C-alpha cells in the first residue's frame, strides 16, 4: 500500500511543498522569512477576523467601536494590538525577505520575483487601508493626503480621487469601502503567495553561494521545518514583547484623537514602514514627480534582474557590491528617519540627497560594481 502522504491528491501537494521538498543543504537563517511571512499572514487574518466581528465601518461609530473592542470585548485589547503590531512584524519580515533576495541574487528567478513585487504592493495597500479604519486623526488625514496624490495624474486625476472617496472628501463611503477592501485583500494575498510558491518550486530555492545545488539536496522535513519553528518562536516572542510591554511604541499618539476634518494635525505621517517611500515622495517639489518617485521606489525592484551585470549570482564573494548593499540599507534607514521629521531645513536636503542615492545605487552603482568585479576576476 502506497503511503497516503504520497498518493492522496491533497496530501501529495502538501507533501511536495513542505515535507519531501528537495532543499539546498546550505540555506541560512535568511531563508526563514518566507515561512515567517506566511505565519504573519495567518496571524493577521485570524486576529482581523475577530476584530471585524466587533468593528463598525461607520464614521460615527468606528472610533468608539475600536475603544469598545479594547475595553469591553474579552481579550479584545490583545487581539487589537496583535493585529496592529503584527503588521509591523509583517513588514520587518518583508523587508528582510526582499533584502535577502537582493543580496543573494534570488531576483534571477524572474517570475517568483515579479509576483513578490506584486505581493509587496498588495500588502502595502492592505496596510494603508487598515490604518484608516480606527478613524483617528492620523487615520483620516493620512487617508486624505495619500488618496489626494492620485489627483496628480493628468486629466483623470481629480475624477479618480472623487471616485475612490465616493464623494467630495474622505467620509462614510470611503471608510466603508476601505473596510471591505481591507477584509478581502488578505485572501487575495494568500492566493498570490500560493502562486509565488508555485513558481519558486518550479526552479527550487537559491542558496547563499548562488550556485546550482541540484547535486546536494536534503528533504525539507525535518531539517527546515525544525529551523522554521525556531524562527517562528523568535517571531512570536518579539511580537508578544511588543504587544504586552509597549503596544503603542510604533503607533502615532494622534490616532487616539477621533477624526476631525476641521483640525489638521501638525505633522501628518504614515506608519513607520511607509516612511522611506514618504520621504522620497516629499523630496521632490513637483506633485506628479513626487508620486512617480513614490511608485518607482518599489517598482524599481522589477528592473533589477535586467541590471544584473556580474558573472556571479550572489554577493557572497563580491565585496564591492556588499558595500553598496549595506549603503542601501543605511540609506533606507536614513529615509525612514527623514520621513518622520517635519518638512524644514536640514531635513529637506538630507531627504533629497538620500533619495538621489537610493535610485543611484540601483540604477548606476550596482551595475558598475558588477562590471568592475568581473574585471577583477580576470586578474
UniProtKB/Swiss-Prot annotation:
Membrane topology per record: Multi-pass membrane protein
Residues where heme b b562 binds: 83, 182
GO molecular function list: metal ion binding; ubiquinol-cytochrome-c reductase activity
Sequence positions that bind a ubiquinone: 201
Record note on cofactor: Binds 2 heme b groups non-covalently.
Subcellular location: Mitochondrion inner membrane
Keyword Metal-binding tagged: yes
GO biological process terms on file: mitochondrial electron transport, ubiquinol to cytochrome c
Gene Ontology cellular component list: mitochondrial inner membrane; respiratory chain complex III
Cofactor: heme b
Alphabetically ordered keywords of this record: Electron transport, Heme, Iron, Membrane, Metal-binding, Mitochondrion, Mitochondrion inner membrane, Respiratory chain, Transmembrane, Transmembrane helix, Transport, Ubiquinone
Gene3D superfamilies tied to this protein: Cytochrome Bc1 Complex, Chain C
Residues given in the record as heme b b566 binding sites: 97, 196
Entries under Pfam families matching the protein: Cytochrom_B_C, Cytochrome_B
Residues spanning the membrane: 33-53, 77-98, 113-133, 178-198, 226-246, 288-308, 320-340, 347-367
Note: Heme 1 (or BL or b562) is low-potential and absorbs at about 562 nm, and heme 2 (or BH or b566) is high-potential and absorbs at about 566 nm.
Family per record: Belongs to the cytochrome b family.
UniProt cross-references to PANTHER family, sorted A to Z: CYTOCHROME B
Cited function: Component of the ubiquinol-cytochrome c reductase complex (complex III or cytochrome b-c1 complex) that is part of the mitochondrial respiratory chain. The b-c1 complex mediates electron transfer from ubiquinol to cytochrome c. Contributes to the generation of a proton gradient across the mitochondrial membrane that is then used for ATP synthesis.
Subunit structure: The cytochrome bc1 complex contains 11 subunits: 3 respiratory subunits (MT-CYB, CYC1 and UQCRFS1), 2 core proteins (UQCRC1 and UQCRC2) and 6 low-molecular weight proteins (UQCRH/QCR6, UQCRB/QCR7, UQCRQ/QCR8, UQCR10/QCR9, UQCR11/QCR10 and a cleavage product of UQCRFS1). This cytochrome bc1 complex then forms a dimer.
Protein's name in the database: Cytochrome b
Organism: Poiana richardsonii (African linsang)
